[in-house]
Amino acid sequence: MLTLIVILAVSYLIGSIPTSIIAGKLLRGIDVRDYGSGNAGGTNAFRVLGWKAGLAVTLLDIVKGAVAAISVVVFFEAHPLGAMPDINPVALRLIAGLAAVFGHVFTVFAGFRGGKGVSTAAGMMFGIAPVSTLIVLAVFLLTIFVSRYVSVASIIAAIAFPLVILVRKYLFDLGEGLDYYIRMFNGHVFIHDSLDFHLLIFGMIVAFAIIYTHRANIGRLLSGNENRVTFGRHA
């Protein structure tokens, strides 16, 4: 039980690192939450700080989710603080990733006012199911290209993830997932692309959560006041 608590605590703290706020302070001496949509996420960083800073913030937020879902769990599996919890391995990684997403949305380092959790959730999912996540990433990028709304792309991508898992698992009958050995650095890296049932259920929960955290964006979309992304507007 102690190991599980520590995994959740460490994952939450990793997710709580307010990357966009730090970037705003370092680059322009501002709090990005005082500008644009008022959100401390990658999308608002794109609007307020420019595409370079926005891209860096988004990538770091993705890394937070992946680190929580993979590295934190793997570390404590190798160095447990007592007995490891009797939980399905994929479910344990999902729980750790969720703690990071929760930390991103309710960051202890910035008055519990963080981002919407999309990038951190994407990082978590990539760490557990990389192939499915890459498919969803393609959907996300295509939606941004067509609509120019990051909020729309985020919502559609969130809905697409459990659908991709469902199709790959049952329609293509891939079972619990596939294993890959990728040649890298004069060796081979083992990657497991999970299609575990827990991932499907969790993907549905995350989809509802992403839609909920975008309720203000949905309101602005309906009223025609949502900001569109214009690439290259800032340096």
From Swiss-Prot:
Keywords: Cell inner membrane, Cell membrane, Lipid biosynthesis, Lipid metabolism, Membrane, Phospholipid biosynthesis, Phospholipid metabolism, Transferase, Transmembrane, Transmembrane helix. GO terms for molecular function: acyl-phosphate glycerol-3-phosphate acyltransferase activity. The keyword Nucleotide-binding does not apply. It is found in: Cell inner membrane. One of its GO terms (cellular component) is plasma membrane. The chain crosses the membrane at residues 4-24, 56-76, 90-110, 126-146, 152-172, 191-211. One of its GO terms (biological process) is phospholipid biosynthetic process. Its main location: membrane. Belongs to the PlsY family. Probably interacts with PlsX. This is Glycerol-3-phosphate acyltransferase. The gene is plsY.
